[in-house]
Amino acid sequence: MRLHKNKDDFTEAVQAVSRGLNISPALIEKDYYVTLVLKRINEEISGLIFKGGTSLSKCHKAINRFSEDIDLTLDSEHLTEGQKKIVKPTIVKICEELGLTINNLENTRSRRDYNCYQISYPLLFENDEIDPVIKAETVFIQECYPEEVKQADSLIGEWLKANGFTKQAEEYELIPFDIHVQTMERTLVDKVFALCDYMLLDDMKKHSRHIYDIYQLLKRVELNDDFRALVHRVREDRKYHSLCISAQDNADVPALLKRVIETGCYKKDYEEHTRTMLYAPCDYEEAITGLEKIIDSGMFAKDEDYERNTIHISVSSAAKIASYKEYRLCKMPENGKYGDYTYKIPNKYVSINRSEKAIVFHLPKDYVVELRNGRTNQTAGLTVTEFAAEVADKDESAYGTKIIRPSQLSSDGNTHKKETGFNSK
């Protein structure tokens, strides 16, 4: 039984959690419905990935901010026209089942790359600062990576278990559930670019939340070479979209962040909106130091080495982008001979540009590509330029039959001996 179907128990639970956590009952109520909608969509749609600010609070426990939107996408395997087509009717069915209303249903379309479903719920607790509408956004424009499995739960569910009411939590189906979620590292990268984009578009309203989220994420995310590689890969993906201004080749992200700090363009919105959504206080002057850390780290500076070694491999059809052959790279030899170890190309070096039907490799300086077909060396020790020419000159079928999907590629860069990695199934 759903808790909101029992009005008395629901009211009592919301009030108890509100007192226990010192949070507005209107926030507790909305969080319940946000979690419920998320859970049901996750149960019904295969390949779903949860991302954005709500994933940071609900799954990663990285921020102390109430986030009211549900940001969803599909993984690369399920990002098909057929799967996109079922998303809208599934969300409609779920809302009808839960007694919720989609206010803008006529403005949504099946198979569209972006939809925002504005979902209203039966309101018991009013608060002028809380919009009683859940925004469930489905975005199928950019590939979502990396991802991991986390648990999600409502504030009511967490409070019930923490206070020994496990039986009641189970009775009202308020137990945690597993969901695929975008990693904190990727979300941090997205938020830095988004903060710059909204400033350039002069659209600061309700977007100062990114400043707070960046500040909190920096407590959990390590700014290292892997993170820098991720920044580069995301930038390559974003720059093909016209509204992603800060990802364009001529954009200087550190300079844009410096402008955010110096102009204080987000300060008013932070004071009026973001601060009111925090469970724990964090003033603007404290949060803005996160941008200074990003600037000082150099993670978003243009990387000449990566720029020089980025190559695009055209693919004949969109379908072939979803699955491709196994590529490997190895370190440039110092003695003229290639070593006994090669590296399966980690996800951080490979991205997929669906709009241009291309596989994109971002290779660090002094690396070369080694291409194999599962039986013998097809070509070894190609330079980046030679590799691009070699692949472009041959049909994909020339490289054997083993298919490795992007989600299956190694992301840790662990070494594999030549004689074992290529023939294993």
Where are these regions (language model features)?
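Short, motif-level signal for alpha-helix interfacial/capping segments enriched in acidic residues
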Residues: 46-50, 322-324
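Feature detects long, helix-prone N-terminal segments enriched in hydrophobes
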Residues: 307-417
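Structured mid-to-C-terminal alpha-helical surface segments
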Residues: 1-48, 58-64, 75-307
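Non-Sec secretion/translocation targeting segments of pathogen effectors
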Residues: 411, 420-425
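Active-site glycine-centered loops adjacent to acidic/histidine catalytic or metal-binding residues
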Residues: 53
